[in-house]
């Protein structure tokens, strides 16, 4: 690859007028006895006279060369070019190049000449390691990297509005806060409104938001739609904040490129790309209880860290909120048309001053195991259990009753209180019963495990 790169540099560009390297005036036979003594110190290396007989010092870059039999030839890699009546040795590539010695050379040929001289003195060879200046490199707007890297352009555009959200809980014994969970979100108003998933902020611990520039803020929960899994929180920041605008998810087409971005590790944004598998995967088809919403299915990887972050199109518009990963290659996002509806309803709720609500909370995200979904999972997950029904746990939220009881992602709830579970709705109905400890049987691999868990009441 290095040799190919050198060849490209050496062959790019066209000289004004190349002088011949052999021609009229040369003897029919070379007589070495007639040659002057061989040179001993040639900075640009040795070559032969144009007739190819006697050794002489080669002309270096920008030194004069000529047409006559006794005129010096250019060093290897240089061309004798005549401009304005004067012939000089020139490098086919006049672009700067960075050498392995950390110096910037005006051309590849100059670097090669310096390398040859260094080797003649017993030093290490200098090799080209980078086009352009050693400190800045070379930005070529016409190169394929800059012309066709549209994903990087999208990420650069949206990243400033993506935030990291961290939830804290208090340890009563030690009287200090510790991180309990985290997720992502994105800013939708210049005064600090942020959208994320409801499950990211459900436990209502203290929320801390960190932006990509490192600034941190305490956040307040403004509104939550548990059914749609959308939450609106707010920070107080000085000045106007960068925002993302919503696109229209109804215009999405299968096969369209999308970018999922999140900030699972504070300042370190993660980016995944994929295509839209379908823009209308029904919630009931996924086994999501009471769902009247279609989800966007994509093969862009969505995980717990970038959950709540934006799924954007190539125009940088938000067309969904990353929300659910079933397995590698099967992820789901809440469509932007549903987000738009939530924001309108939230405005109305705040205007009418509706109070908070309470609900029982277990801390899992699940889906029913339909025949179609079973087939998909068996294709994606090696050794998937031979189940025909149940509630598949897609995610266990940290610091929740589910995690404390020992439930894990990938478990399948097959019974509650001795009654078979056929869908996620059976689990949801059991959670709603007040003061009830749930006695579950879950299938983990090929083993059935009994687990007892008591849902917690939380306030929205």
Curated annotation (Swiss-Prot):
Signal peptide coordinates: 1-18
Domain IGFBP N-terminal: 22-92
Ranges for region Serine protease: 183-343
Keyword vocabulary terms for this entry: Cell membrane, Cytoplasm, Disulfide bond, Growth factor binding, Hydrolase, Membrane, Protease, Secreted, Serine protease, Signal
Domain Kazal-like: 74-136
Domain PDZ: 344-447
Biological function: Serine protease with a variety of targets, including extracellular matrix proteins and proteoglycans such as biglycan, syndecan-4 and glypican-4. Through cleavage of proteoglycans, may release soluble FGF-glycosaminoglycan complexes that promote the range and intensity of FGF signals in the extracellular space. Consequently, facilitates inductive processes in the developing embryo, such as posteriorization, mesoderm induction and neuronal differentiation. Regulates the availability of insulin-like growth factors (IGFs) by cleaving IGF-binding proteins.
The protein's name in its UniProt record: Serine protease HTRA1
Gene that this sequence comes from: htra1
């Amino acid at each position: 690859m290095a040799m190919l790169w050198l060849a490209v540099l050496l062959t790019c560009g066209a000289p004004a007028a190349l002088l011949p390297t052999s021609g009229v005036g040369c003897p029919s036979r070379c007589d070495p006895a007639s040659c002057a003594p061989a040179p001993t110190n040639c900075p640009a290396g040795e070559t032969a006279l144009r007739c190819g007989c006697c050794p002489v010092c080669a002309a270096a870059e920008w030194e004069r060369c000529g047409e006559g039999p006794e005129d010096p030839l250019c060093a290897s890699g240089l061309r004798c070019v005549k401009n304005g009546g004067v012939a000089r040795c020139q490098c086919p590539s006049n672009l700067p190049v960075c050498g392995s010695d950390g110096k910037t050379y005006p051309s590849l040929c100059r670097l090669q000449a310096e390398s040859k001289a260094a080797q003649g003195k017993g030093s290490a060879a200098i090799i080209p390691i980078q086009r352009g200046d050693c400190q800045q490199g070379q930005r070529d707007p016409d190169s394929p990297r800059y012309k066709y890297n549209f994903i990087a352009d999208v990420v650069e555009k949206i990243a400033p509005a993506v935030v990291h959200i961290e939830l804290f809980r208090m340890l009563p014994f030690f009287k200090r806060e510790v991180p309990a969970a985290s997720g992502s979100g994105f800013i939708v108003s210049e005064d600090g409104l942020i959208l994320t998933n409801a499950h990211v902020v459900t436990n209502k611990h203290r929320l801390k938001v960190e932006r990509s520039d490192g600034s941190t803020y305490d956040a307040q929960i403004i509104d939550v739609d548990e059914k749609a899994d959308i939450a609106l929180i707010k920070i107080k920041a000085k000045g106007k904040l960068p925002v993302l605008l919503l696109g229209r998810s109804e215009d999405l087409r299968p096969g369209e490129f999308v970018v999922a971005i999140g900030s699972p590790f504070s300042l370190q944004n993660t980016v995944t790309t994929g295509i839209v598998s379908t823009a209308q995967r029904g919630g009931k088809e996924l086994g999501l209880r009471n769902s009247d919403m279609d989800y966007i299915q994509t093969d862009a990887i969505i995980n717990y860290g970038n959950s709540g972050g934006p799924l954007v199109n190539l125009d940088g518009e938000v067309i969904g909120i990353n929300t659910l990963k079933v397995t590698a290659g099967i992820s789901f996002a809440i469509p932007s048309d549903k987000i738009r509806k939530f924001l309108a309803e939230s405005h109305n709720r705040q205007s009418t001053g509706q109070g908070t609500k309470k609900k029982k909370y277990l801390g899992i995200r699940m889906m029913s195991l339909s025949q179609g979904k079973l087939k998909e999972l068996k294709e994606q997950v090696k050794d998937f259990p031979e189940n025909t029904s149940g509630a598949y746990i897609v995610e266990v939220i940290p610091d929740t009753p589910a995690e404390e009881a020992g439930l894990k992602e990938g478990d399948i709830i097959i019974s509650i209180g001795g009654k078979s579970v056929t869908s996620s709705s059976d689990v949801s109905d059991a959670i709603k019963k007040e003061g009830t400890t749930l006695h579950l049987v879950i299938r983990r691999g090929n083993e059935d495990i009994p687990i007892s868990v008591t849902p917690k009441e939380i306030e929205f």
